[in-house]
Amino acid sequence: MSPQVRWKVCWENELELSDHTELADFFRKTYGPTGAYNALPFEGARSWSGARPELRVIGYDAHGVAAHMGLLRRFVRVGEVDLLVCELGLWGVRPDLEGYGINSMRIVYPVLQQLGVRFAFGGVRQALRNLVLRLCRNGLATVLEGVRVRSTLADVYLNLPPTRCENVILVVFPIGCSMSDWPSGTLIERNGPEL
């Protein structure tokens, strides 16, 4: 039986310190099993990894945070085209709830329409390919492979270049337009840190 999840949409400025602390704990427990390094950004009460979200969609159940997705409007460059998008990041479902079909996209999609963007996108690691394909089977999104995303690092380090380029699986959600309106190009310039 699917657990009862209640969803909350909130702007970043609406979060209290206790919210950040609870979310940081959620991310450590959700991302930690995928590799200790993945949980490092969420030390203390830090509830973001790179860029901070503008909006958050948070699912709660009787045990606390059950699921999360962060949203951030930004301009990216796809090939030669500048495009206002909503980046989706900080996706997560608490490990004990995986496989129950908890999906925030039915909550996120109307929010994306209100934000006035034509596309939402998120980049995920190759290891999550099957999960993303399941997420997109309802036809709301298209999976693009062979796309590189160049981002700035969240912090500047003397021993590292200021940008990195990653081969990711890109999930693109057309919002009130057609997927054919997505510009062609195999490089996306994020011009900022990933969400």
Curated annotation (Swiss-Prot):
It holds the Pfam family NodA. It comes from the Bacteria. One of its GO terms (molecular function) is acyltransferase activity. Its EC number is 2.3.1.-. The keyword Transferase applies. Keywords: Acyltransferase, Cytoplasm, Nodulation, Plasmid, Transferase. N-acyltransferase required for nodulation. Acts in the production of a small, heat-stable compound (Nod) that stimulates mitosis in various plant protoplasts. HAMAP family: NodA. Belongs to the NodA family. This is Nodulation protein A. The lineage of its organism: Bacteria, Pseudomonadati, Pseudomonadota, Alphaproteobacteria, Hyphomicrobiales.
